[in-house]
Amino acid sequence: MPLGRFLEISLAATDVAESLAFYESLGFVQASVGEAWPHPYAVVTDGRLSLGLHRADIASPLPTWVAPALRERLDTLATLGVTVDEARLDDASMHQAVLRDPSGQPLRLLEARTFSPPALSPAHSSTLGYFEEFALATLDLVAAGAFWERLGFVAFEPVLEP
């Protein structure tokens, strides 16, 4: 897949400790994070879905993938007609890029993983159940579908009525 491996849904958190306690009360488990970010950061997971809690000015929610060899990955995306909104590829920071779908939803690509997932039993789940999908609003279903298909996703039949 051109995006890489899915990492997390990044969320802006005004108080990371408070957010962490909230998600833990729902059955999520804290993952071990490194010092990848210059801001407070924590990750919780139910073993299937990881939520990155960032005390930073980020778009939220922000689906995030790990894309090794990010420079080359961005070249591949360009050949697919995908425009990169922002890229940081300097030696002083973690390599990352942000692109947007036709409806403006940002997606982030990181060159390296920012946490180590904990070992959880396959039977572990949060009190919320299992994560099924991440739905995005769009005014142009055809353009949005074409964008995501270029990135390797497979479209279901569109639902045109509520």
What residues fall within each predicted segment?
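Conserved short beta-strand elements that form part of the metal-binding/catalytic scaffold
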Residues: V29-L62, P106-R113, F153-P162
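N-terminal beta-strand motif that seeds the catalytic metal site of vicinal oxygen chelate
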Residues: M1-A17, P61-P63, L110-A146, R150-E157
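Short amphipathic beta-strand starts and helix->beta connectors
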Residues: D46-L49, T83, P118-L120
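Conserved positions at the start
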Residues: F6, H39-Y41, S60, M94-Q96, ...
